[in-house]
């Protein structure tokens, strides 16, 4: 149950070393082995599962710019929504999801 909690976070901080922000858009392999796509949708970024039991379900929505995004993610198995944080670093997306901002877990997704 908790492994899906971290699917996508609320803040995506991108390392700023004078380079352009790393894109969050694309296909990602989740920690549980499913494939998710993060794509632009209506001025935000939507997270949709492409594989697994909940394939086709939108499980998150992020808004923001300049490498910082806020949003929510839903655990499709429990039908609960969480907030969190994350960071894109090359081909890795480190996610941290929290309940009431105190009970947090993290996981890393890999860009496909």
Pin down the residues of each PLM region.
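Positively charged n-region of N-terminal signal peptides that target proteins for export
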Residues: 1-4
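Sec/Tat signal peptide C-region and signal peptidase I cleavage site
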Residues: 13-21
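Central antiparallel beta-sheet cores of small beta-barrel/beta-sandwich binding domains
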Residues: 22-85
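Short, exposed beta-strand-loop hairpins at the edges of beta-sheets
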Residues: 85-106
